[in-house]
Amino acid sequence: MSDIEIKGILGKKLGMTQIFDEENRVVPVTVVEAGPCVVTQVRSKETDGYEAVQIAFGEIDPRKVNKPAAGHFKKAGVTPRRHVAEIRVADASSYEVGQDVTVDIFNDVKFVDVTGTTKGKGYAGGMKRHGFAGQGAAHGNQAAHRRVGSIGQAATPGRVFKGKRMAGRMGNDRVTQQNLKLAKVDAESNLLLIKGAVPGVNGGLVVVKTAVKGGAHA
């Protein structure tokens, strides 16, 4: 595992706005309501074979929680939460069950990775889904302006190779945006202001973690 200390929190994407930096330049940011989360389980190398911390986020009516989940929350001594996620860490001994996790953990962090589920676009063609150029607008083109074009060879190999980029379902995928600059941490309102766009719809669940590629504290 990397030497970087990985910290993570669950949150909800609220939308985008803009702020001004120290040089009065406009910076587009995504506002994420991150936490407060609560630790529901701590995994150690001795008992589980790896180090991780399980955190829970979001309110939910206890009547809507199934019995296995309700028992898990009861064992941890916390009220039921809507979302649960596990964050791999280098050393989980600094966490304990019932502990609150807030945006304060990112006070000294400059870059983060954000994981979310992208907007679903439904069935999309090659131009929208993969950025294909399409075909000529005139010069003999007839009803093929947005078609994909050739998808392979002839009798040899006599098939379409796996992974060929074609039309199909687009979006609704779990993706991670890496090395996004953390513009501001608002501890009072439990908000993270992240430069640029992050995956998903407004109100969607996101996981914000310390950037793994070495630039987190740059």
UniProtKB/Swiss-Prot annotation:
Keyword GTP-binding: no
GO cellular component: cytosolic large ribosomal subunit
Name of the protein in question: Large ribosomal subunit protein uL3
PROSITE patterns: RIBOSOMAL_L3
Keyword terms, alphabetized: Ribonucleoprotein, Ribosomal protein, RNA-binding, rRNA-binding
GO terms assigned for molecular function: rRNA binding; structural constituent of ribosome
Summary of the function given for this chain in its UniProt record: One of the primary rRNA binding proteins, it binds directly near the 3'-end of the 23S rRNA, where it nucleates assembly of the 50S subunit.
Source organism per UniProt: Corynebacterium jeikeium (strain K411)
Domain of life: Bacteria
Taxonomic placement: Bacteria, Bacillati, Actinomycetota, Actinomycetes, Mycobacteriales
InterPro entries in alphabetical order: Ribosomal_uL3, Ribosomal_uL3_bac/org-type, Ribosomal_uL3_CS, Transl_B-barrel_sf
GO BP term, pick one: translation
Subunit structure: Part of the 50S ribosomal subunit. Forms a cluster with proteins L14 and L19.
Coiled-coil regions listed: none
Residues passing through the membrane, by range: none
Record-stated family: Belongs to the universal ribosomal protein uL3 family.
Pfam families according to UniProt: Ribosomal_L3 (PF00297)
NCBIfam families per UniProt: L3_bact (TIGR03625)
